[in-house]
Amino acid sequence: MSDPELAGQVALVTGGGRGIGAGIARELAQAGMRVAVAARSREQIDKVASEIGGIAVEADVSDRDAVSRMVSDVERELGPVDVLVNDAGIAGGSDAKPMWEEDPAAWWHVFEVNLLGTYLCCRAVLPAMVERRSGRIVNVGSGGAYLPPRPGMVGGTAYGPSKAALYRFGELLASQLAGRGVAVFTISPGLVRTEMTAPLGADAPWTPPELAPRLVRVLAGGRADALAGRYIHAEHDDIEDLIARAEEIREQDLNAIRLRR
């Protein structure tokens, strides 16, 4: 069923060819949005776009020129981006190797995709959003940013830090956008079983895959704009309760990930 506040709006979902990103693309299409699905794998995004009646845009989010072309293509075919979902990400390995045996170039590439890619995508859509005084950005984080290490955890020493930086980036960006009509959120989807996380095994505490897409749908609709800049967990946070407590959350500085003394 479509949502009146979202019907006809344009969403761009990076990393939308599979896993969590594909689920978000499907959810936003069901809400009535016109969805652009972006990723490096043409076959994957073509499949999802065909399924939801959207468009597929092949792009490497770590490449500034590619991101500019991606946004231009979406604007030409669908119109200005109303909602950007930054889900594109890579793990870059496992914890099998100690840090001193990791390839520095591969380690840094995780940051180029997970953090720089998010930065470049935000940078590409924000001028138009700020000019219109309307827009929403949802950055998809990970429990790898703050959970204790565990056997089989993906990404070696790169993935978790890249996602931790993403939370802080979202908080700072939201502060810069305050009063400009654009809301930025960072979510944790929980431990969703995907190709990236499958090595954790059947006994891992898996999160239902539909929770993150449902949360993104609520955030995209605007009712949670008072929570801009906050960290929201798809499984452990009740978004309706958070919306009702938005003033308290702001006043008491809740739902923020920070190092504490």
Give residue spans per PLM region:
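Conserved glycine-rich cofactor-binding loop
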Residues: 17-18
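Conserved glycine-rich Rossmann-like NAD(P)H-binding loop of the short-chain dehydrogenase/reductase
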Residues: 31-47
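The beta1-alpha1 cofactor-binding region of Rossmann-like NAD(H)/NADP(H)-dependent oxidoreductases
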Residues: 59-70, 104
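Catalytic loop of short-chain dehydrogenase/reductase
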Residues: 91, 104, 138-165, 170-171, ...
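Substrate-binding pocket helix/loop in short-chain dehydrogenase/reductase
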Residues: 95-99, 103-108
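A short, exposed helix-loop element centered on a Lys and neighboring polar residues
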Residues: 122-123, 171
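C-terminal helical subdomain
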Residues: 179, 186, 202-261
